[in-house]
Every structure is written in C-alpha cells, then in structure tokens.
Amino acid sequence: MNSTDIQQFYARHMQLLDGGAAEAWAGTFTADAVFAAPSMTEPVRGRDGIAAGARAAVEGRAAAGEVHRHWVTMTTARSTGAGIEAVSYVQILATPQGGAPRVHLSCVMRDRLVRRDGELLVAERHITRDDRPAG
C-alpha cells in the first residue's frame, strides 16, 4: 500500500466527477461496486447504476449553474485481506456562476479499495453526512 498512490487516485477520481466525466468516474469503481449515501433510499450496485447517478448529478449542477469541487482530506488507509480500507473527510464546495463559494456538504467517506490490473478501484463506498445522524 502506497499512500501517494491513494492520494493520486482520489485526486483523479474527484477531478473526473467535478469535471462532469460521469462515465470515466464510474470507471474508477469495480463492475460490481456498492455505493451507499444518505441521499439514496437503497445502495446503488454496479458501475452502470453509479454512472447513471453521476450523470444525474452533473445535469443537476449544470441546471443550477453551479460548479462543485470535492475536497478529500485527512485520509487514513490500512491494508486488509479484502483490499484497502480508506476513510476520508470530504467537503463539497459549491460555487454558483458569478457568486461566492460555500460549503455545500461535509461528509465522511469510507471506501474499500482494490487493485485490478495495477489500478486502484472503489469496490465499496459508504458516505455519512455531518449534518445527519449516523445509522
């Protein structure tokens, strides 16, 4: 496990999402990945579902005239038999066209990363929001 590899993975991963590259961003998940967030009634399973959610988010930001930037910080990582468990704080900054940036959300992101063909991929992601009770 190399912390620089993990940092570079998250930088590329979030730049794809923030840049509107929904399909490429979904490609940084395993084909059978699980993505769970408080805004979802059920976890999304599979790369196709993750891509659909990302496309909807990109379209929503465009309609709102906002740019979002995901800031991944304070990442800890440990190797397990199933891959790498990574826990990060994530702040999402939203900037409306012609306006001032604001903190949109503050979250904790818990990932299980795996290596496939030498590349890190997200196999599982669980997000909790700081403004909502856990559970």
Which residues make up each language-model segment?
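Short, low-complexity N-terminal intrinsically disordered segments enriched in polar/charged residues
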Residues: 1-19, 23-27
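A generic "alpha-helical surface" signal
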Residues: 4-8, 48, 104
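Generic N-terminal initiation segments characterized by hydrophobic and/or small/turn-forming residues
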Residues: 13-14, 47, 90, 102
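A solvent-exposed, acidic/Ser-Thr-rich amphipathic alpha-helical stretch
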Residues: 22-90
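A beta-strand edge to alpha-helix "cap/lid" segment located at domain peripheries
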Residues: 59-135
